[in-house]
């Protein structure tokens, strides 16, 4: 469901100016009793385009909490600069994808594993990430095309990791831009 938003949105004591026209997509929804639900729209940046997500939640500070769960995404060249500036690199591709090639100094913790013709979520993902990174480490997160890394980034933000940045597009544009890789 898409709609155009007014130029100013106000939710409780939180207000934000919104550039018209923007789209709303119904993505994040939490299962809460209908009596406690509130609907807000938060910015989501994926593949270098801004979108707005309709978020349903019953928490007091809905806008701030919803926005905290939407990771920042950056193009691969910016991600490379962040890595050079000291950010740690988390590659969430499968071990097979990682072994074919990966960005220099990346640490592999799969977000999903291949099972038959499909994929299943790694049930130990948060525990494995926590064994390599602290909650306040600055981390860039990448995968093959940008989808798994966005999901992983969102999960890490929800779990309390604060320095999470998603790599828009993933490993494909990384190699297309001839950025350094290890095999």
Swiss-Prot record:
Range of residues in the leader sequence: none
Induction remark: By darkness, ethylene, cytokinin and heat stress.
Organism: Raphanus sativus (Radish)
Pfam families: Rhodanese
Main function: Is thought to act during the early stages of leaf senescence.
SMART domains: RHOD
Gene3D superfamilies: Rhodanese-like domain
Protein name: Senescence-associated protein DIN1
Organism classification: Eukaryota, Viridiplantae, Streptophyta, Embryophyta, Tracheophyta
Domain Rhodanese: 83-183
Highest taxon in the source lineage: Eukaryota
């Amino acid at each position: 469901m898409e709609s155009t938003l007014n130029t100013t949105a106000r939710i409780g004591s939180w207000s934000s100016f919104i550039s018209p026209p923007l789209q709303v997509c119904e993505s994040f929804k939490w299962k809460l009793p209908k009596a406690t639900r509130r609907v807000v729209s938060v910015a989501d940046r994926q593949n270098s385009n801004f979108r707005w997500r309709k978020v349903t939640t019953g928490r007091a500070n809905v806008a701030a909490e919803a926005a905290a769960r939407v990771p920042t995404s950056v193009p691969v060249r910016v991600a490379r600069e962040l890595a050079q500036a000291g950010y740690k690199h988390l590659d969430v591709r499968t071990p097979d994808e990682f072994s074919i090639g990966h960005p220099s100094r990346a640490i592999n913790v799969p977000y999903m594993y291949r099972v038959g013709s499909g994929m299943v979520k790694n049930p130990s993902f948060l525990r494995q990430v926590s064994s390599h990174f602290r909650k306040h480490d600055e981390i860039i997160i990448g995968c093959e095309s940008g989808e798994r890394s966005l999901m992983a980034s969102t999960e890490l933000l929800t779990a309390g990791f604060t320095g999470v940045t998603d790599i828009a597009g993933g490993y494909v544009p990384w190699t297309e831009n001839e950025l350094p890789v290890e095999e």
